[in-house]
Amino acid sequence: MVFGDLNERPLKKRRFFVDEEDTHPPSSEAAPVTTNLDTSTISSAGPEGSDVRQQQLNGAVPFPNVKESSRESPGLGPEDKQDNLLKEDEENNGTVDYEILNHSPSIHAQQDQRVDQGLTNGFGGQPSGERTVSETQAFQSSGGFDTSTFASIIGEHLSPESLEKIRKASGDDLERAVNIYFDGSWKSSNNSLSQPLVAPHQQTLSNPCTPVNESISQTVNTKISKKPNQAPSSRCLSQSSRYIGAFGVGAWATRSGVGLLKHGEHVNVERARSQPVSKRGRGGKLITNQKGDVLTRFTNKSGQEIGRLPRETAEWVSTLIDQKICRFEGICVFAPDRVRVNDTIYLQLWCYLRKEAFLPRNLWNMGDDNRSTAFFEEQESAEEKQLRLRQVALVKLFDEIGLQPTTVNDMTKKHKKEGLLRAAEIAEQYDKTKREGKSNESSEDEESPELEEDQLDTLYKKAQSFDFNMPEAQPPPSFVLNLRKYQRQALHWMLAKEKDKKSGRELSMHPLWEEYTWPTKDVDDKDLPAVEGQAHFYVNPYSGELSLDFPAQEQHCLGGILADEMGLGKTIEMLSLIHSHRNVSPSRQGPSSSTELVRMPSSSSAILPAPNTTLVVAPTSLLSQWESEAMKASEQGTMKVLMYYGVDKSTNLQELCSAGNPAAPNIIITSYGVVLSESRQLAMFNSNTQGGLFSVDFFRVILDEAHVIKNRRSKTARACYELRATHRWVLTGTPIVNRLEDLFSLVRFLQVEPWNNFSFWKTFITVPFESKDYVRALNVVQTVLEPLVLRRTKTMKTPEGEPLVPLPRRTIDIVEVELSEQEREIYDYIFTRAKRTFNDNIEAGTLLKSFSTIFAQILRLRQTCCHPILTRNKTIVADEEDAAATADAANELKDDMDLQELIDRFSASMENADTAEAQDPSAKFTTHALRQIQTESSGECPICSEEPMIDPAVTACWHSACKKCLEDYIRHQTDKGVPPRCFSCRAPVTSRDIFQVIRHQSPSSTPTETDLYSSTPASSPHPAPRISLRRIHPLSPSAHTSAKIHALINHLNRVPANTKSVVFSQFTSFLDLIGAQLTKAGISYVRLDGTMPQKARAEVLAEFNRTETFHQEEIDEDEGPDTPRVRISSKNSRSSPKSPAVLLISLRAGGVGLNLTAASNVFMMDPWWSFAIEAQAIDRVHRMGQLRDVSVTRFIVKDSIEGRMLRVQERKMNIAGSLGLRVGGDGSEDEKRKERIEELKLLFE
């Protein structure tokens, strides 16, 4: 028989065709169902009793009156029937192409497959092994197809050839023939049906991996790509499918009739899915917007739909069929003689694992196994959902047929099934919530709960149970620094981790995999054919993979997490490891683990080893620090360091780092941004970057400040996963920032099996945690941490009671700042508006939906506490700046003027006059007045008669008086409604034209307690300090100071000489304002923030640290026996007058990693929600190498939201449950919302 091509058949017509089954016709495919059967229906009809029939369903009693020909060799599928099938198809002239597809076939491929299935089975609905040639001929010559009726329905008379084509395609079914006509498939060409019939299950494969024909081989090569170093089998099943078990199911009828289905009759299973609506998301990822159809139908031998499988069973059976994992043969156990809609029909389904299930999947296109589960992700892609469904389907199938593993990991045995199903349930529930549009209200609740401070302590407990008797290791002579005892112990631990060869001692099964034995008897207790060399198969329930090869765990993690608290010298410890463990052999130690993560696609060019090179990846701000530390710690000529950043990226690393190159660098330093950039290029061009980071296999890779990759879904983290190295290390003071998933990303980078599989992680950590089984979850996390992490804190004490690191004392003071009257008015206005919004949302019940609006107003309040100008429109501020500059240019006055410059200007104007008569009298008076101010001989105040004047101030006409007297005088005249005039010359004056006399501290004198605005002369033998005139009410908005800036400068003026300070703020615009005021105050400073390129950052740090602010004698006095040697040249023994005294730095750019021990004063200008972030910044100064006591000042505005933020911090830190295992937001969703509302109420009290 020759049929038309069905490639163009509309989706809505697909219900008449079997879905992409290649080994059996629709008649031999059935989907499984649950064993929760309603046996009361069985007892009411049929000759057998309910007990016997239930035993038949469970496989205990064989079914009577079932043709033995249908299951002579169930273990091999339908191979035993191939002779009859071949004869039938030869007589029918049927042809077929067999194609192995991936689990996401195209529509055309699905339709082709349906035609193939129909050809293979004659469209009769009966198993091919039971149909004889005579039956087939009789079926084809049936007179049931009425051509006149068909023509009257379609309204057209067709040619005999077309009628014959449609009649054969429909199997003499008039209804199906009408559908075939209207969908137009009968007009398509039949080129795809021109090959002789070769069904895969009818071949005896001499080579298990050899395709049965040319088309199969081509399809496999083009549609299934082998994952590099993948554990799944390199062998294939020697037949198309193999029996693994059977189970019973209670289906339901969708039509009524008499004699539709009989006991013992074979049934067909059809998967008729509606195509889900999909679209391409970011990065080309396919996003499914509609829930897929899981309808699974069964038909009788005539092709009539009898009923459907219940949804709870069809959900996973459809997955196994669609993804070509299993096929099912169904037998009717019981059906009423007269079937009515919704009647229960009992079936027994025989399950066979298909050959395609053991083929490697193209995981690169669908995302790797860790990414693909998309736990708590915004949207689940189609590929990610397929993996989740595959996992659940396999677990439920094996549970249904009672198939138990013969070998399983002890750790996974107890909670595997519950964990996997619960993880899938959570993901499905989250997907449902997103579809229903509830994300706005509970988006943050859907995130995994945050860990409280006490929980983090619990997690770190084992890692921090440091053995002070641990052996020590001495670095080689090439390392010139002296290590403290705890650092030498760390070096011994790291060397032990890197040189551990435990994986080579014994061949053990990978912990993610389970071993199963192929059944030797079927459900009727009949022997199944044995296959030589294939007694077992292996399943990875966490990735859904199957294998016939033993999945060995070839290598475990040769690295770890160095999690010493900030400031304990992790960089120095790691440099000592680089010196101590170098690769002496140029040859590598074999290939990477077969179970390692999915690699990016690579070109034909080999990835070359770099056996002598360590790659260091660090934040941009730390690159120069790593370079300088590496050179300082190494004997000259023993360490070659390459900065791989910016223009230096032109280096070809494959050539430079090759084993035979004596100039190969020992250390390559690069940034996370460079890794991400080259990763994008690699993915974009589908090939290795020429000589880039991904073209070599490093000896060691180190991630500094590794909490940068805490988000496993971030592009930076995924790029770092792809770096190749024998040894992998992460350095971070905070392995867990606030969620358990933070640790997973580090574990995945380290390739710690089995924990680097996110499905496994979810099953044994996330799911128990979500289910409030905190003890089990956190115990497991401690088990993960213990062998991987070495963590010491500055608070640890030795057995002798001495501190682990003898650091100088650190004091933290909170200074309350009073806002000025104008600042308080602005703050109160914004606070009132924010509180009104808060109350309105409380009354409307929409508080959590308006989080972004409320937090935006909270941000404005915090900015007001720093400086009111931060809350204003930038365009308006810029216009006001221009207007102020224009006004100053008109009257030749500025907001801030140097007194000596004014005297010089007016003196020059008089000297340039030709004659004494030509000289301007006002200029002469001004010069005289300014000189009096300079020499402090201006006399008594003309208003209060105080002598000398208190805080002298001058008007624009250069007459002097006390500042307070002058301001009161102008205010008094203004209140009387009289235009203010100068008390001396009666010239018009305004409050904006009053200039305060500012006497700056001498740069070489010791500051006193003098206030910023005090004019009291400093008694000093040094030259007179600089004096400036500063407008009390500046015209320029940015020239206005604020209460916090005022307090900061007061504190800086009281800082002892030769002492440096670091000022942190999270607002870079606030740093701009602070910098302007420091310039006016004559305080030198440098600045570092995230907008600066790497070279500029390095220059700033070098300038700030270039001069030690203390004498060599001071170092010698303070240096203890365990203090690392520091080298200070004699030329830097004393401060340079031009050395910057202050470093302005943003909290984000400088909060981690930097070494700022040159300073001993820290000023935190604004609080952060978590004090841990502030503590990280403080530890940049209070760390190993600091020789002075550290003073920390936190500025908090009194009676403001900043004070309430501190209370929220304290409240969170003080909340603790039993056993220290309470999580933030613990409890129901309502309880979580109540907590958030309470915190907001606390902010708006």
Swiss-Prot record:
GO cellular component, one term: cytoplasm
Motif (DEAH box): 704-707
Bias (Low complexity) ranges: 1129-1138
Binding site for ATP: 564-571
Stretches the record annotates as Disordered: 1-85, 117-145, 430-454, 999-1024, 1110-1138
Keyword Glycosyltransferase: no
Keyword DNA damage attributed: yes
Ranges of Acidic residues composition bias in the record: 442-454
Domain Helicase C-terminal: 1047-1227
Role according to the record: Probable helicase, member of the UBC2/RAD6 epistasis group. Functions with DNA repair protein RAD18 in error-free postreplication DNA repair. Involved in the maintenance of wild-type rates of instability of simple repetitive sequences such as poly(GT) repeats. Seems to be involved in maintaining a balance which acts in favor of error-prone non-homologous joining during DNA double-strand breaks repairs.
Protein name stated in the entry: DNA repair protein rad5
Species, as recorded: Aspergillus fumigatus (strain ATCC MYA-4609 / CBS 101355 / FGSC A1100 / Af293) (Neosartorya fumigata)
